[in-house]
Amino acid sequence: GLWSKIKDVAAAAGKAALGAVNEALGEQ
């Protein structure tokens, strides 16, 4: 359903955001 699609997109976006934050912190 629509909710499962939204959850999948939100989970993917969250993982991408965490990855970007981890990369930024790792460079410091």
UniProtKB/Swiss-Prot annotation:
Organs and tissues of expression: Expressed by the skin glands.
InterPro entries with a match to the protein in the record: Dermaseptin_dom
Key words of the record: Amphibian defense peptide, Antibiotic, Antimicrobial, Secreted
Subcellular location: Secreted
GO biological process, one term: defense response to bacterium
Major place of residence: secreted
GO CC terms of this entry: extracellular region
Pfam families linked: DD_K (PF12121)
Described function: Possesses a potent antimicrobial activity against Gram-positive and Gram-negative bacteria. Probably acts by disturbing membrane functions with its amphipathic structure.
Homology family: Belongs to the frog skin active peptide (FSAP) family. Dermaseptin subfamily.
UniProt name for this protein: Dermaseptin-H2
Organism: Pithecopus azureus (Orange-legged monkey tree frog)
